[in-house]
């Protein structure tokens, strides 16, 4: 069992691996053509003479018994040519001197990130090959790669962990939050994964939203990782990654970050 960078000859095998993969993982390639584009992007990034972060990607595969059973990736300079949008969960304090009243409210608010960062993503393992340290190996290989060539990466490293979904693989948070802004027929489940930052910025007000009016099931899962992503979440924490208070716009999964030189 070992991890290496993806090669062009891996295209069909990678596509076979991910074609029936997790529909909620928006960074997974959607077609064989896109798989080939990702591999080419990775190869081009690796062969750059000027080794600095510049919208690069590195795609890795995990092989076991001569079979590709998992993939993962690194993306640099995220938000360099456009902002990244999250919800930031925080406390808003209100007070009245007249009535000697104070209260702390739990709110979420759109938060844009403009400074470039490196993102860890696209971690996917075949269901039959999950466990026994495979996910850790696939993920930790990225840290080793970054340690060998730190000049290729931004100083801030971010990992978005998938949030909770229902039995039909729909985002619990989005189901309850979005109904305040959009009709049910605006999106089907597949289209939700293609919602981009521009759409969010244009369609949702910038002021803070109280968490309390949301359905209780939606409130409870803000910033909580999906059960399948919990091992990855714990592994990232063991490597010194910490929550930055931001969550994904769609599934409200937690966002972790760490400085490149502080990763264990």
Residue ranges, per PLM feature:
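Glycine- and acidic-residue-rich phosphate-binding/metal-coordinating active-site segment common to enzymes
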Residues: 138-141, 148-192
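Conserved beta-strand in the GNAT
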Residues: 59-61, 67-76, 119
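Conserved acyl-donor/pantetheine-binding loop and adjacent beta-alpha core of acyl/acetyltransferases
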Residues: 76-122, 181-194
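Conserved GNAT acetyl-CoA-binding A-motif
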Residues: 113-123, 146-162, 172, 219-223
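Long, charge-rich C-terminal accessory regions
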Residues: 181-264
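Conserved acetyl-CoA-binding loop-helix of GNAT-fold acetyltransferases
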Residues: 125, 131-146
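A short beta-loop-alpha structural element at the N-terminal edge
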Residues: 2-14, 27
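Helix-loop element at the rim of GNAT/NAT acetyltransferase active sites that forms part
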Residues: 16-32, 42-50
């Amino acid at each position: 069992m070992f991890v290496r960078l993806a090669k062009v000859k891996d295209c069909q095998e990678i596509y076979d691996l991910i074609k029936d993969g997790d529909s909620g993982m928006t960074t997974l390639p959607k077609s064989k053509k896109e798989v080939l584009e990702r591999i080419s992007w990775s190869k081009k990034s690796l062969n750059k003479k000027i080794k600095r972060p510049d919208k690069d990607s590195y795609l890795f595969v995990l092989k076991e018994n001569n079979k590709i059973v998992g993939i993962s990736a690194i993306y640099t300079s995220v938000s360099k040519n456009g902002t990244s949008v999250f919800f930031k969960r925080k406390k808003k304090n209100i007070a009245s001197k007249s009535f000697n009243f104070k209260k702390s409210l739990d709110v979420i608010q759109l938060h844009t990130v403009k400074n470039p960062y490196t993102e860890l993503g696209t971690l996917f393992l075949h269901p039959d090959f999950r466990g026994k340290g495979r996910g850790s190996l696939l993920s930790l290989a990225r840290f080793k790669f970054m340690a060998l060539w730190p000049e290729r990466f931004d100083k801030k490293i971010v990992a978005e962990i998938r949030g909770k979904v229902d039995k039909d693989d729909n985002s619990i948070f989005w189901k309850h939050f979005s109904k305040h802004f959009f009709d049910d027929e605006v999106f089907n489940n597949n289209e939700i994964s293609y919602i981009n930052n521009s759409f969010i910025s244009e369609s949702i007000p910038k002021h803070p939203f109280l968490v309390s009016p949301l359905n209780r099931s939606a409130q409870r899962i803000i910033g909580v990782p999906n059960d399948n992503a919990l091992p990855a979440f714990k592994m990232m924490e063991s490597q010194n990654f910490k929550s930055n208070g931001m969550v994904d716009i769609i599934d409200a999964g937690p966002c972790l970050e760490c400085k490149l030189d502080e990763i264990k």
